[in-house]
Amino acid sequence: LNVPYFHLVFTLPHDLNPICLQHPRIMYSLLFRTAWQTVKTFASEPKFLGAKTGMTAVLHTWGQNLSLHPHVHCIVPGGGLTAGGKWKTTRSDGKYLFPKSAMRIVFRGKFMAALKDLAKSKTIVLPNELKKKLYRKQWVVYAKRPFAKPENVIECVSCFGHRQKRPAVSLLALSPAFTGGTRKHVGHLVFGDGVF
C-alpha cells in the first residue's frame, strides 16, 4: 500500500532465555501474539488511530553475536480501516507510530499475564523471584522512525534475512516459516483479528 510504514521491535528480557530454550514454540508464539495484541490495542485507541491496522512480523531468536536474543521485528502501516471500511491515517507526529514508553508497559503486562496463565496451567515453571524480577524490568520496545517511502519496506524485510540461505523476501509470498544459515526466522502476516 502507498502509505507510511513504521518499524517496531519487541524484545524479551534475557531472564526468559532458559524458558525460551525449554519451550521455544510456546514462548515465540506468545511473543508474536503479545506484540500483535500491543499494536492492536494502541491502534484501536481513538487518540492514536481508532482503526484496525495490520502487521508483518519476523522472529529473530539470535542477536548479532549469535547469543540467544528473542525479538520480533514488526512492520506496521501508518493507518488502518475504520468500522465503516474507510482508510484512516495515523495521528502520529511523524516520528513514531505509538508512544514507546506506553508500549513497553502494555507489552510487558500482556506477556506477563499470558506467562502467568501458562504457569498456572503447569505448562511452564515460573518461579516467584523470576516473576518479580520481570515486573521490575523495563522491557524493550524499539520504535524506528517511519520508512521514507513504501518501497523501503521491501529493503527492510530483506535485511531481516541477512546471511540466510533463503532470502527473507520469501515472506512476501506468505511463506509460513523458513530456516536457513545459523538463525531461525518465522514470519506471519496478520490483518485485523488474524490468528497466528
What spans do the regions from the language model cover?
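Beta->alpha loop/short-helix hinge microenvironment recognizer with preference
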Residues: 1-196
